[in-house]
Every structure is written in structure tokens, then in C-alpha cells.
Amino acid sequence: MDMHIECINGTPIVNTLDHLPPLPLVVKYIFPITEQDELGIYHALRLHGRIRHINLHLPPSMMQQCLVLMDTHFPMLEYLSLSFEGDKFTTLTLPKAFLAPNLRHLDLPAVSPPKRLRLLTSSLPLVTLVLKNIKASSYFRPRVLVARLRSLPQLEELSIQFSIPIPRPSAEWELSGEQVFPVPLLNLKKLCFVGVSSYLESLVAQIWAPRLTQLDITLFNQIIFALPRLSHLINIMQSIGPKFSAAEVFFRRDEVSVTMPRHASALYFSLRVRCVQLDWQIDCAAQICGALSHELSGVKEFRLNIYDQNMPTEWQNGEIDPTTWYELLRPFIGAKELQIHDGLLEELSRALRVEGRDPGFLPNLQYIIAGTNLFTWFLDTRVLVGRPVRFSLPPGSPLVPDMTIHRHSSAPERVRRRMLSRSWSLRA
């Protein structure tokens, strides 16, 4: 039986805890905090030898006092999550003397780990390691992280998220000499990263994760993206099961994402780049897809999506070079279906008009799926070059008589039924 005592909001810990059996403690307090709760937190933390679980979300000043009380040994602690309310510029650090040899779950969304990640040397059973909002003052190089990961054989989930783009481009040369024999992380299944591509490349070059199935990456914007090590990692992911068969590029207000979602297997890949202007987003997506062209070559269903029903007003004035769209679409040589959101129809119709005569462009494409057929010229051209493409309405659209659709023949009903049951459509 898992018998323990819960120290939570609203419980009179100070007056009752000393009169209860010495069972393990679960300490869980979430803002807002009363004066009684605050005293209860401090009282419980002083009993560090009995604490099994700590989950605190507090104001910065109160969290600072808790960290002072945590500057010691927690022999029973298995779960630790520390975050604070409000001020994102406050820097709080886990004390150097804090040790938790039985820790299995470490989640620090706001509190920084000790310098050089010394905490990890004493937490061998760790299964989940989440370090978020890492500031410049808490920066650690990939080789330091990997050296600590070497001693975590049970690790299944790793999340490293920087709050700013570090290192700066002028200092990225420091990462180029960090290529070493990869450290095996035999149980790692999920990797999340937020930062710059040079750090990501250095990190994935130093690990070997044969069981990785989920990869979630967010990169800060930069001029050039080179991702050979990431490409290799995705190849390893696909070697353990079916390859990715569907992909989506999603243009949002402040980021663009390239996603290959779960389909018949547990594999999941998502890469986002933080940028605002549409031309930047298209260029970033084109570079990402180009860098991962080998991994995208097996995709059969490709979708272009945008966060608004129509092209946002602030994006309508800029002229997008059609060749940029061409570079984005070019890696999808195996795609049979191209689904286009209504907000992107005019942009894509212009781009396909330019590139329609290239027989090497989307050579296996069979269907364009969209709410309106603006692709007559492209469809006619593909017939002339011997690579016919059909137009089809998306699932759920009313079947309105349309001469263009009849002329080029819509997708068979069996394809429409399959599209209606498709599970790969992504979240907005």
C-alpha cells in the first residue's frame, strides 16, 4: 500500500503533522498561497528525510525561501517540480548541497539547476529530466550535459529549453570541437529542445538513442539552417518502425512548424521556427524541408496550413517569390496528395503556375485537395507533360457542381472516404 501524508493548500500542517505517524510526505502547493499554507510549506520542507514528492508553484520570494530550506539531502525524494508565479526575469537556482539519490522525475520550468548540472551526478534513477527557461547565467555546453546524461541509464524523457538564443553566433565555434563518441541513451523515448540549431546539432551528435520515438524541437530564427545530425537522428527513429507517411507545414502568427505526426506508429516529429513575417516563415520551412529531404521523401500525404481562414491582412501586401514555395515543396518527391488551406490558395496557385512544367517537381502527385480550384493551368500542364493530377474538395465540403472539377475528375469516392477517416490532421 502506498501510504503517505499530503501537505497541500488548505491543510493545517503545522498543527497536525507532528501528531501523525511518520509516513512519507507529498508536498504540493500552488499559488495563491495563504499565510497558513506558507507556514505549512516551510514546516514540511524541514522534514526533508520524509519527503517523497515536491510540487511547488509559488511567488518568487516564497520560492527563494523554500530553496534555502532545500540546501540539504532528500534521501526519499522521487519527484521534484519547482516553478514560480509572475516575474520571468527573476533568476532562482537550486542550492549546491541539494541531493536526491532516488529522484526519478525532475521538472524545473523556472528554477535553474546548479552550475555544471552537479545535481545529476547523484540522481541515477532519473527517468524524466525537464529543464526549461534556461537563461544565459545558467548556460551549460552540450558536452557538460552529455557527460551528466552518461550516468542516467533509465532516462526516458529529456527536455532542454533555453529562454534566449545562446550561444550567440559569434561563439558557436566553441561547439564545433565537441564531437565525441556518442553516449548511449538506451531508454530515451522523447526529446524536446528549444534553442539554436548549432546547440541542437552538437547535442544530437553526442548521443545515441535507438528507442527514440518523439522529437519536439523549437528553434530561434536564423539566416541559415544546417541540420545533418538531426537528419541522422530521424533516420534512426524511422529504422525501428514504419517511416513517416504524412507531413504538415503550418504557418502561425509568430512561428512556422514542420510536423510529421503519428499515423500507424508511435513516431512523432515536430520542428518549429520562431519568426513573424510570412516570407521568412516560408524560407525557414523551405530550408528545414530541404535539410530533411531524405526523411521527407517517403511522405505520401502533405498539407499546407495557416492559422487564419484567409491570408492575414498584414501578410497580403508583401510579394512572395514563387520559387520560395517551389523550394518548400520540392523535397516531397513521394507525395501523392497535396492539401492546401484556403488562406494559401492564391499564393500556391501562382507558385504552381510557374513550376508546373518541371517534370521533376512533385513527380508522384496525384491529387490537389482544396476548397476552391485555382489550379486549372497547373492541372492542364501536368496532363501535357504526362503526369496528370486531379483536383478534389476537402473532406466535409459540399459537392457543388463545378465544370473544372468535372473536367479533371475529382478523387474517387474511396479516396474521399479514406480522407474523412484520416487521423493525421493536426491541431490548429
Regions found by a protein language model. Give the residues of each.
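Leucine-rich repeat
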Residues: 1-428
